[in-house]
């Protein structure tokens, strides 16, 4: 393979004029330079000359790649148009010198100011296609950009989605060249497949039409026969319905006349009884007012007592608070006394320290003055000073210089050790002061507070236990009273229910009692008697009660018996005993069918038989009384089922509204109560009610105070629970704080003993060793000075040591020590001032606490006096309360007697009114039934008219005179004037008015209708059959053509898919096989010899069948890290992973050179070293690396350097190169 040996840039971006760059024989070249110098422009130049588009070169349009100079100010006198023009050239080019074997190929790309670009190879202009073919032959893929990595591309690769990564593999593998053809063929297949499927569906549909039309021709004749049969059956059904409606109406008319006479007689009796009752009520109201007034007085007195008791408890709360406040203040005073004593000790200690330091300062100042007085004694004249200087130079020459230097080094070391020793002494002093002045004091306070909290907690627990015992006793008393009250209320509720039943339905109760006595008697004599219908069934839900009673109707009080023989024997027995009448339902002879609902299940309606509970043995009887009736939630639902859904059965709403089978709508009737008692039982119930009310009232009054006290105790327990929980939390927190305080004291002691003190000892030892060494050197220095300055010292009269000791160095040392003493005095004064201020503050707090204690004691005394006064008032009120209770008891006894007398009169009147209402309801029911039968007759006749049913008429008025649109009185009159001839109705239908006859006719009509519905005649069946046969031939030919074309295109598609998949998988398999090894090498510790050291990396295809249409997941696991997705890796880890992928892809179709622009930007030093080491290992004559980098860890490993810098005067980037192969690593 070839290599890139050099570049030549002319006016390209920041490079003005012609700039040449040579890479020589280097296989690892680094381009370096400061930011903004033009390094990345070099990358753009390489990309530009190799055909990369401008949008990848950080420029929107090509002309922006031409160098642009800086124009001078237009107002300048030196402005030169020609110079300005030359600084902005009109074109630019880049040449790349590519070594291919022994031949050097010159690649050139030119760009003009108007945006035109051209390409040359060895000076010959070629097209872009030829230019790119030449590069592709050298494995330089322009579209895949396998030869370069732009700045920022590494981060983009690491952040790529699986689909984007798959797209990159397509470009590298070359499978993308088949993408367009693949998608076009796939689209054609989908269209052809859709068309063929649609055509097959049409063919099947037309074939079905042929069969349908053929069958329709055969059904037309059968349809005509069945239609005639249906008309005859509908005629019989209409005659049967009209005949029985007329019979039922005649029976009801006779019964209505008898009821009207009985109602008139009962009304007279009621008027006489009401006048007598009014007189009794007036007397009763007056006595009731007296009792109410007495109860009100008793309530007011009781409320006054409750208020005083509440006030007494309210006094207890501030009493307890005042007691706690006094105890708290006393403990605070004790604590403040300790603080005062301790702070006075601190003040005395710092005053003593201040005196000691001040005396030391005064003594040192006197010493300085004495040294100043001796200064003139050791002063040299000018000649002696010259002599001293000459001798001093001789001294330095003969070894004094070395000694002075050693002594200076020792002094410096000594000063550093002293400073460090002073720091450790300060740390020890700080820790000791922290322990004595803060932590110990805080610990004492925390310990005291903890003991106080424990005492408070024990007191609260004791009080909580006492309150719980009291609360349990109160709750036990209240529960016992509540149970008694519940029992009494339950009895009262039962009594009231029974009273309501008896008072509202007195007549009906007597009838029901008589009926039940008869049934009980029949059960004794005839074992086959089962019981009353309403006793043997009941609604599943309470809301169905009214609807079920409406449906049962006259069968509500019917008697279910085992067979017809038992029923006949029972009827004969009742006649013989003159015991009244009853209806019987024999289980063996009644004919029923299982009711079914020809509608989807819904919560809006339900079959009546499904709404009741009963024993399985009575199922036949329940089917008989319920029939196929339906219970609906609302009237609108019932109307919808009747007239829109065509339901023929009876429809009843839960409010009692009824729609008959014939379409007649009537109101519902209320269900009767279950328990009915006679008049004597009613009187005993009223007496029991009054007695229960008095007992409940007495029990409630007795428990009122207990309930109030229980609530107060319960609130107190709740508050105590909260206080105990808070105190326990505080105790825990206080323990934790105390443990932390002790732990901190231990920490500071351990710090002093184990760390600071050993270090101080060590430093002192070092200081002693330095002093000994210094003394030896000083002695050696003095010996040398005495030898050299011997004659001179004899002349001046004092030694050189004495002279030097009284020089400027001594004065500076004394000044420094004096400053240290002054600083120490200032520190002690500040501490003394702080402690003095703190002592004053504590003293003020102590005085305030004393005053607070006096105020709390005064408040406590006042509260005790208030408590005594309230207790006296409570005693007085309790006596008054007892007196009023006794008076109320006497009044209530008299009231009960009067109430019993009044109840007796009301019961008599209520019985009469109840009987009257029963008669009126019965009369209204008969009227409604007559109207119902009239409406059903009108409806039946209308149905005949609408359905064209010809029934025989013997009157002049016919059904043609009946209006269809309305059902008013006129329509009923017309209906009643129509006489129908029933001779054509068979005898069995005249005698049978049961559901079996109706269902038999309906079943026959339904069977015929089903046959007619199945036949569905089609008059044009033959004509349409011929038409469909022609269309089937056309669509069949079209379908076969589409299937053949689909097969042809599918074969072409599979070939293209195979080529595309093979190219893609070949690239993927290669990269996947080499990726892990490359990543392991990039992440391996350079010092590790383990073969499998480093991280792991892998690629996974999401779709094995069409990998190019799905994504590729890239997973990289750095060394010693657990597995996680790429997005959760750090920036450096992502960069290394991306580089491993790039290197693996490059190794598949290796380009002759690989240019990397600042790929190490996000890497730390270790990873940069690994990348550099990888490049050095893999560089070779067939693989040249050119790296743009700012990090010396990278470029110091390269074979050659290309330096880029900015020439500010020319406003241009410049190049310098350096071959590193001549230098040792």
Curated annotation (Swiss-Prot):
Coiled coil (UniProt feature): 173-489, 679-1063
Predominant cellular place of this UniProt entry's protein: nucleus
UniProt source species: Saccharomyces cerevisiae (strain ATCC 204508 / S288c)
Cysteine-cysteine disulfides: none
GO process terms (BP): cell division; double-strand break repair; establishment of meiotic sister chromatid cohesion; establishment of mitotic sister chromatid cohesion; mitotic sister chromatid cohesion; mitotic sister chromatid segregation; sister chromatid cohesion
InterPro entries: P-loop_NTPase, RecF/RecN/SMC_N, SMC, Smc1_ABC, SMC_hinge, SMC_hinge_sf
Record-stated family: Belongs to the SMC family. SMC1 subfamily.
Domain SMC hinge: 527-641
GO CC terms of this entry: cohesin complex; meiotic cohesin complex; mitotic cohesin complex; nucleus
Taxonomic superkingdom: Eukaryota
Subunit structure: Cohesin complexes are composed of the SMC1 and SMC3 heterodimer attached via their SMC hinge domain, MCD1/SCC1 which link them, and IRR1/SCC3, which interacts with MCD1. The cohesin complex also interacts with SCC2, which is required for its association with chromosomes.
Keyword tags: ATP-binding, Cell cycle, Cell division, Chromosome, Coiled coil, Mitosis, Nucleotide-binding, Nucleus
Residues involved in ATP binding: 33-40
Motif position, Nuclear localization signal: 1057-1061
Domain notes: The flexible SMC hinge domain, which separates the large intramolecular coiled coil regions, allows the heterotypic interaction with the corresponding domain of SMC3, forming a V-shaped heterodimer. The two heads of the heterodimer are then connected by different ends of the cleavable MCD1 protein, forming a ring structure.
UniProt function note: Involved in chromosome cohesion during cell cycle and in DNA repair. Central component of cohesin complex. The cohesin complex is required for the cohesion of sister chromatids after DNA replication. The cohesin complex apparently forms a large proteinaceous ring within which sister chromatids can be trapped. At anaphase, the complex is cleaved and dissociates from chromatin, allowing sister chromatids to segregate.
Name recorded for this polypeptide: Structural maintenance of chromosomes protein 1
Alphabetized GO MF terms: ATP binding; ATP hydrolysis activity; DNA binding; DNA secondary structure binding; double-stranded DNA binding; identical protein binding; minor groove of adenine-thymine-rich DNA binding
Anything else known: Present with 5710 molecules/cell in log phase SD medium.
Compartment(s) where it occurs, according to its Swiss-Prot or TrEMBL record: Nucleus; Chromosome
Gene: SMC1
